Amino acid sequence: MRLATILSSAAHWSRAVLAVGAVSLLSACDYNFWRMDGHQSTIKVEGPVAKSQLDVFYVTCWVTLVIFILVGAVLAYASIKFKARTPEEEKAIPPEQGHGNPLIEIGLIGASVLALVIIAIPTLKAIWYTYDVPEDRKADTYEVTATGYQWWFKFDYPSEQIAGAGALSTANELVIPAGRPIRINLRTVDVIHSFWVPKLAGKVDMIPNRANHLWLQADQPGYYWGQCAEFCGDSHAVMRFRVIALGPKDFNDWLTQQTSPARDVAPPRIATKDAPKVQFASLRTFKQNETGITAKYDTSPLDAWKAHQFPEKGENPALIAQGKALFKEKACLSCHEVRGHGFAGISGPTLTHFGSRSTLAGALLENNTEQLHRWIHNP
């Protein structure tokens, strides 16, 4: 009777646990419930490469869950069934131990092999699928070269050649056409970095003196967060970038803008030294490691990025002339390129069309007056 009572109680608790588990699994359909829909979510994916990797994760989870339940059930049964219930049973001599049961041992080995095969098949398929663009889609592939520096990313577009300037180059914001496979050649000029856009593809390392690559695709236009995923020095944690996927027309318009020289504005007739000075807003005090990135936008992140593509509204030619003079005076041109103005530095990120970017400082800060002032004064 006592055993029956124990088993009945165990059954009651098991039903309660299963009910809680069922509610949890159903709730998982809503990514917000588990806070799995963040900027770097690997669960709410938006591309075929990340989707194939997520499928492997799910298969592995289900297989291990089944194993966990079976092993746990046998362990629970043995613990209840053969528990010593009296002082005499606690002091009893254990029964004679045998060498084992060949049938059970062979069965367990077979079950283990089966579990590994179930995991291995989708894993191998995903490895082959994610290694390179599928043959039937290679004709539609767009190619980009990503180069890691301490601590920023450079993106070159080999198919977009600019007369006298080589391939189109940008920094920290990778703009791609949505709905097309993108092959990204991975390079580094210093240490090992790792290129990772969680919603679009798993990470792949950038290794010195070694050519590496990955491919990804954004199914729809969108704004995605990327990150270096390999410790690469003091500022590794803030080595970030963005991926912006655009529709065909928007992407072609962006290419047209980016392959053009940086605009030149006629200087004012007054001397630069007499030009009005920049009036900056009061700078807030940032805590250590606070990024300054807005968590919520009044509009979508993609629309916020698009708003940066036409930054000429309200421009002041006098201030532009003053800034250009300061750019020369402070020797910014020794590191940074501004195409069309004779500034051809190569060691730092290109600043051509800098105003069209939504971020600065390695995609750590928003590109606005306050954050730009903060960055220039204390990089």
Language-model region placement:
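Transmembrane alpha-helix boundary/anchor motif
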Residues: 24, 74-77, 122
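Exoplasmic/lumenal beta-rich domain surfaces
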Residues: 356-359
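Alpha-helical transmembrane segments
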Residues: 66-85
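N-terminal secretory/membrane targeting signals
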Residues: 1-32
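Non-transmembrane, membrane-proximal soluble domains of secreted or membrane proteins
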Residues: 30-59, 79-334, 340-346, 363-379
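Hydrophobic single transmembrane helices highlighted by the model
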Residues: 53-72
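"…together with the soluble PPM/PP2C metallo-phosphatase catalytic core" -> "…together
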Residues: 351
